[in-house]
Amino acid sequence: MIGNLKPLEIVLIIAVILLLFGAKKLPDMARSLGKSARILKSEAKAMKKDDAATAAPTTETVADDTVPPQSTTARTIQAAPGDVTSSRPVSEAKPTTQS
């Protein structure tokens, strides 16, 4: 369908996009889309790595009913590999005591 577009139609589509979003917002939108794509790609790689790590043991083990203690260190979510400007700490639910 996209291959059937003529050059004039492509120019008209670009003009409509510029009119809708404005020339100032388009670079920011493209940058945001690129960051989102990098995050999605890194998360997909991490999931594949986790799946490979859990699938590697082929021996049967007995399930342990104990719950491991939660870590008290703060975790950080990083938007993209090497992108330290958008790193932020994870806000975890903490019990509140109100009198």
From Swiss-Prot:
Q: Where is the composition biased (Low complexity)?
A: 53-69
Q: Name one GO molecular function term.
A: protein transmembrane transporter activity
Membrane disposition: Single-pass membrane protein
One Gene Ontology BP term is: protein transport by the Tat complex
Task: Spell out the Pfam families in the cross-references.
Answer: TatA_B_E (PF02416)
Its main subcellular localisation, reduced to a broad class, is membrane
Query: GO terms for CC?
Result: TAT protein transport complex
> Where does this polypeptide localize?
Cell membrane
Q: Which domain of life is it from?
A: Bacteria
Question: Could you tell me which residues belong to the region Disordered?
Answer: 46-99
Give the multimer and partner information. The Tat system comprises two distinct complexes: a TatABC complex, containing multiple copies of TatA, TatB and TatC subunits, and a separate TatA complex, containing only TatA subunits. Substrates initially bind to the TatABC complex, which probably triggers association of the separate TatA complex to form the active translocon.
Function, as annotated, reads: Part of the twin-arginine translocation (Tat) system that transports large folded proteins containing a characteristic twin-arginine motif in their signal peptide across membranes. TatA could form the protein-conducting channel of the Tat system.
Q: Please name the HAMAP family in this protein's record.
A: TatA_E (MF_00236)
NCBIfam families per UniProt:
PRK00575.1 (NF001854), tatAE (TIGR01411)
Protein known as: Sec-independent protein translocase protein TatA
What is the originating organism of this protein? Streptomyces griseus subsp. griseus (strain JCM 4626 / CBS 651.72 / NBRC 13350 / KCC S-0626 / ISP 5235)
Question: What would be the name of the gene that encodes this protein?
Answer: tatA
